[in-house]
Amino acid sequence: MLLLLSVTPGLAANNMASERLKGYNYGYIYGVGNTLCGLVIDKLVKKKYAKDLLSGTVKALSESPDHKPYISEIRNAYENITEDIVCKEVYQ
């Protein structure tokens, strides 16, 4: 029983770190997509460049073994930013 209690805080810390990394990966892709969207709207970069850079970033992260636990968050962020009311036109 004592051993189980001593392991529990470690498990909680691992779960918290995992949740933070999920949020980080979601925010990273959504943030990159949003930034590129704004640059296209402001006519600072071409649509094709933004689309290619965002999809390439998502592909690279999705293929990385280190990011395997976060593929769902990466894909959700990509879907959400490409369907965003403002950015939809940029990524279609």
Predicted segment positions?
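N-terminal signal peptide c-region/cleavage motif recognized by signal peptidases
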Residues: 7-9
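Generic detection of intrinsically disordered/low-complexity segments and helix-coil linkers/edges
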Residues: 5, 18, 22-24, 64, ...
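Structured catalytic/translocation cores of nucleotide/phosphate-coupled proteins
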Residues: 12-15, 70-72
